[in-house]
Amino acid sequence: MNKNKESLHLSSPAINTHMNKRSQIWAAFRSAFPYTIPIFAGFLFLGIAYGIFMHSLGFSAIYPIIMSFMIFAGSMEFVAANFLLGAFNPMNALFLTLMVNARHLFYGISMLDKYRGTGKKKLYLIFGMCDESFSINYTANVPANVDKGWFMFFVTLLNHLYWVAGAAIGGIFGSYVKFNTEGLDFVMTALFIVIFIEQWMKEKKHYSALTGLGLSVASLILFGGNQFIIPAMLAILGVLTVLRKPLEKAEVSV
């Protein structure tokens, strides 16, 4: 009897540790989910549009489902659909993918500190990073009692699942849709406008936002609508790196 009591007593710390870990994971999920609700609306509509688009090209539902799960890069998935219809040209696909998604290089640099200490979750966080997940994970004020690694993991996972679900719905039920889906992609543009406004409202002074906006407009004028993103991000990264300390002092002094 005493041995049983001793074994229960010895195992209780392990049980408590397991329960604490589960509660931490659940708390991170509950904190992350509300942030992803706007993404759910955008990804669902855009994912459905992508699934319908793939169906219109003659692909079965399995194609948008697998591509949305494995690629998870909205704009490139639309481009990849056309690659599947043309001659096999892997180098062209490689360079076009790098050009379209080169902004992720800057996302990765920005998230180096935030991803530090996340353990094995880092691999999925890197794979699943998209514009929307980056925006949330970089700007969200995570509560002190919530594990930031699990918070970022669930933000990334939920956004990924939303996109796959939308693509699956569009691919499966695409043959039943008879309305014109042109313009559905504007949902994501509207979403980024909302994210920008929220970030603007959080800042006491808007130096960084105005810098990003001004440099983006200048790059758009100089390089045109198809090639302005990379120059704009390089300019923003350089200017904000040089002015980082003055900007931080200005924010603190307010």
Curated annotation (Swiss-Prot):
* Membrane topology of the entry: Multi-pass membrane protein
Q: Which Pfam families match?
A: AzlC
Localization recorded for this chain is:
Cell membrane
- The record lists the membrane-crossing segments as 33-53, 65-85, 153-173, 177-197, 220-240
Its main subcellular localisation, reduced to a broad class, is: membrane
Alphabetical GO CC annotations of the entry are: plasma membrane
Q: Does the keyword Electron transport apply?
A: no
Could you give a single Gene Ontology term from the biological process aspect?
L-valine transmembrane transport
Keywords recorded for this protein, A-Z:
Amino-acid transport, Cell membrane, Membrane, Transmembrane, Transmembrane helix, Transport
Which top-level group of life is the source organism from? Bacteria
Query: Which purpose does this protein serve, as stated in its record?
Result: Involved in branched-chain amino acid transport.
Which family, according to the similarity comment? Answer: Belongs to the AzlC family.
Name listed for the protein in its UniProt record: Branched-chain amino acid transport protein AzlC
